[in-house]
Amino acid sequence: MTSRILILIAAALLAGCAGIERETRPTVWLALEPALPEGTLRAGGPTVVVGRFAAAPPFDTDRVATRERGGQWAFAVYHRWAATPGEMVAARLREALGRLDLFGAVFTPPAPLDADYRLSGAVRGLWWDRESRSAVIEIEVALIAAPARLHGFWVRRAAVPVRGDTVEAFLAAASDAVAQVIAGLGGDIAGALADPSATPGREP
């Protein structure tokens, strides 16, 4: 009886140690760091408030999404975004708009004044495509002129090759993809601001 009790205790301890080992595996937090333009604000330019972007399911999570070969989706447990894709993209776009010589001020809501424009959007997808070996992002953005007139609507998508099989390689490619869509949106917004009569358009 005593030996049986000792065996049960040992088994319980081993199971507990295994659980502790699983729980202490570190989570790797990732943040998009796209290269940003080297400009500044435009003196006397219009003002814009850039709100938090939404993210379409199943990408409305901090877990890194992977499209495996065969089209199956997987979501990492130990590799997570430091914020949701919508939050990160909106923050990086906000930073970029402060460097594109387009606006006199770029605000995070709530803005301290009634801005001339409001920029809203959503991340349609952000994932690691294993089959095409690329980092893919697709976003949509709407530019609203005060008080509530649609001044522009665009969809941008970029796919950048992932040069390696590590999460670091994916992160570098994803950051480059975000930089590409931000650069494209910069051109879209510049065109809309230069032509007040411009009709909303979509990238082919």
Give short role names for the model-derived ranges:
Residues 1-6:
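Bacterial N-terminal signal peptides that target proteins for export
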Residues 170-204:
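Compositionally biased, intrinsically disordered linkers/stalks adjacent to structured regions
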Residues 44-46, 60-62, 69, 77, ...:
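Envelope-exposed proteins and targeting segments
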Residues 74-80, 147-184:
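Short secondary-structure boundary motifs at beta->alpha junctions and helix caps
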Residues 18-85, 192-204:
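A structural "domain/chain start" motif
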Residues 13-16:
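C-terminal motif of bacterial Sec signal peptides marking the signal peptidase cleavage site
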Residues 18-30, 35-39, 95, 99-147:
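Surface-exposed short loop/turn segments
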Residues 86, 90, 94, 100, ...:
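Extracytoplasmic/secreted envelope proteins and their assembly/folding machinery
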